[in-house]
Each structure stands twice: as C-alpha cells, then as structure tokens.
C-alpha cells in the first residue's frame, strides 16, 4: 500500500533548532542585503525556510528535497512566499546551483513524517513494509538490501552504521529467518526478531534493541554517508565570499564528517569548535531534537 501523494496532512514535521539556524546566518556580513539568496538543502516540511522567508523580506530560497511527500507539504506551507521559494526535486548531493548564494542550511537525517507514516517503513512503532527509502524512486529498499547481502556483509553494515555490538548475532538471525521463513511481514516482525538476539533483561529498556539496526539499514538504503561526503566536498563552491553553511546532524557518523570537513577544508573558516545543541526548552517540547548538533562554517 502506498501513501497518497495528494494527502500531506500526515506531514507534521517540527523543524529542529530554528532559532539557532536563524542566528547562524547573522555571521554573513551582507545578511540584510536586498539581493539575499540561499539554499535549504533539506527542505522537509519547510519549517526553516518559512522562518527565514518571514524574517528577510527580500530573501529568495531554493529548497531541495528528494521526498515528493515533503515537497508537496512544503509547497503548501510556503504558499504565501511562492514568489520567493523555488522547490526542486533533488538530493543535495546531486544539485549544482547556477549561481552562488549567501548561505546553505541542511537539517540531516530522517524527518518526523517519515518516521510517523508506517507505510514508509522507517519505524517499528507501527507495522509497515521494510522500505526506509527517503526517495521512493530508489530501486533498493530495506527488504531487498537484507536479502541481497550475505551474513558477513550484513553484520559489517549493522556494526558500521549502527555501532551495534551484537551485529554478527543479529545478521545471523536475519539471514536464518529469511532462509527458513521467507520475507519478513513488516517492520514489527523484523524488530521482534532482532530483540530476540538480546538477553531478556535488555529487551525492555528505554531504547528498543532494534533501534541501532534500523538506523544502520536506513543509512545504507539511502546511502546517507556517501551523499553527505559528496555534499560537504561540493558545498563551499555554492557560496559567495563570506557565505555561511549551517548543518544540523543527528548521529555521530554524520557529526564526525561535518566536524572534520569544517576543520580541515582550507576553503572554510570553522565557526563552531564545539557543536551547538538544542535548548532544554526545545528538547522538552520536541524529544526528537535532543540529539541534534549544529555546526557552522564560513567561506573565506
């Protein structure tokens, strides 16, 4: 069963660290210039772009997103600014701007609607197909991925992207299940099988035992690390002199890449030796913000 593209009512993503993103752009010396242009590399529901377009009346933004559901929702949210927002169907790693811009913002990782819509297959809280594709046009979903990989490669993937110490045991169980029973019925069955690899006392902790494995599969399906590396290499070329790049990451693999890029890229001046984290008030209001880390750099 597919999600109806005409219905974006389920898309209720809360953008993270919006105040901090706004403040980061004040580092740009011409932020109040009448010809201000920027790129929202992960448009999502349009929350960050909405706040920026509302604050800067002369600002024009190009909004990128590979998820068609996000683009539909964002276009509705940003309708009052339709003359100043240009929404593109693109992964940020594949985009090449025609002209340089004043800033680029990126809010990485899975968004709330992708998690909350069971038909997208990102979560085991509600049963859904083993999908996990941010772009529904990708050929390989999570189901095809676990079928295609051998046990060793699956274990390595779960360990590399999920930092899961029981990766070998989990991979062995997944491949055994597939051999004996065929495909999993959905996300809940896979999560239940993974949980069975843990000692009983570890199965009912605050963090579900399948969480790290699901993260690893999602990262692999969407090639999140590869596309981030490509983006980080390209993005300084998108900026005008003094331009700002602000990136929010949500897990250690992403944050290490962003930190290293901002520190070692000779084209950039790193403006955040330590990442900016969400306020206590925001985390209380939006629990999913708690792992967010914002890093900022400026083109020299």
Curated annotation (Swiss-Prot):
GO biological process, one term: rRNA base methylation
EC number, as in UniProt: 2.1.1.199
Chief location of this protein within or outside the cell: cytoplasm
InterPro entries, per database record: RsmH, SAM-dep_MeTrfase_MraW_recog, SAM-dependent_MTases_sf
Catalytic activity: cytidine(1402) in 16S rRNA + S-adenosyl-L-methionine = N(4)-methylcytidine(1402) in 16S rRNA + S-adenosyl-L-homocysteine + H(+)
Subcellular location per the Swiss-Prot or TrEMBL entry: Cytoplasm
Residues reported to bind S-adenosyl-L-methionine: 46-48, 65, 92, 107, 114
Coiled coil (UniProt feature): none
GO MF annotation terms: rRNA (cytosine-N4-)-methyltransferase activity
Top-level EC class as recorded in UniProt: transferase
Keyword annotations from UniProtKB, A to Z: Cytoplasm, Methyltransferase, rRNA processing, S-adenosyl-L-methionine, Transferase
GO cellular component: cytoplasm
Function comment: Specifically methylates the N4 position of cytidine in position 1402 (C1402) of 16S rRNA.
Family, per entry: Belongs to the methyltransferase superfamily. RsmH family.
NCBIfam families referenced in this protein's UniProt entry, alphabetically: 16S rRNA (cytosine(1402)-N(4))-methyltransferase RsmH
Protein name, as recorded: Ribosomal RNA small subunit methyltransferase H
Native organism: Prochlorococcus marinus (strain MIT 9215)
Gene name for this UniProt entry: rsmH
